[in-house]
Amino acid sequence: MVEAFSGRSGEPDYSRVTNPTVTFYERKVKEMTGAASVSAFNSGMAAITNVFMAVAAKGKNIVTSKHMFGNTFALITRTLARFGVEAKVIDLTDIAEVERSVDANSACIFLEIVTNPQLEVADLPELARIAHKQGIPLIADTTFIPFTEFDARALGVDLQVVSSTKYISGGATSLGGLVIDYGTFPEIDRLIKNELLFNLGAYMTPHAAYMQTLGLETLDARYKVQADNSLRLARMLKSLPQIKNVGYIAL
């Protein structure tokens, strides 16, 4: 027991924070992404919350976009604000504005790789350059584009946040979230795994990990069909005279 609860045994000891099924799932995602570390959570919002708890503190600010999922926006601008974290909500497609906004108190630059629902796309390498110049991570919610389809690390992303409820789960069988860490800021991963997963109670359930491990096997094939169907639908809608505009990134 002493070995287990001190963390020296390397074996699972308490299923709310370590479980072999969840660990297997994390390792599969790690292999698929080339990440340094992966942490699985019980929802996408749980993953995002843990990342912000790891990088931000009172007096810090998060440089982010005005376009994103509503609950994420509320987390940054309302919930974290109660703990003294400032939200700098700007246009991340305006690189000059980003340069002006990042300062010595910035904790990170955070964005959705494709914004929900506006489908706005920012220049990731430029944002990474600005973030790294200040010594802070670029954190991207990449839920809209599965990690099988692009290399976030090559674009300068330090940490990916994913709602695995979406494409990975696929069949609406389970909820989940992932933090995919590429190792450029190892202190973030240490804080998540050694403190936040223990204290915030947001660890993924073994059943969800099992279902999403199965989902990984068909993710690439399913996404290609979904993307093809979506493009066909968008083109059809665009051809209708009753519709003035179709906001779809692939058109």
Predicted segments, located by residue:
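Conserved N-terminal alpha-helix of the aminotransferase class I/II PLP-enzyme fold
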Residues: 1-49, 71-78
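Conserved PLP-enzyme active-site core in the AAT-like
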Residues: 37-242, 247
